[in-house]
């Protein structure tokens, strides 16, 4: 673990509208990660967070709703990943899911929606998105609407691999 051959795009995002750095994935490599790939991505997210000095990363599995919805794959997989995290199967991490983006990022929203007992809601270090589309929209929104600064890389390679967006600023590309 992780299995060989799984590459994933991991970004570190700094936004004035959030109280700390966020590590997010996958913005550009895996269009629709399957469950095993999500396990690997969690490993990459936690590894990146640890490189930033976070001992026990808090990871939010993003879905359309914070309720477990049996017909929504990101919802059921988020719940399963959270249970695996509780049992230590994903390493020294705290995983919660499913969490809608607003619940994940804002404690007040979590309280308003009566999401109780979450160590992640309102304070995640990492966001695991269900697919490339949602992650990419967040990535671009963070840079353009929140004036965020981003550093991005491909994890799972044998040598360091930085991957920038064509629309990134010169500063971000450096």
Placement of each model-derived feature along the sequence:
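Anion-binding alpha/beta catalytic cores of soluble intermediary-metabolism enzymes, centered on
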Residues: 1-120, 125-129, 134-174
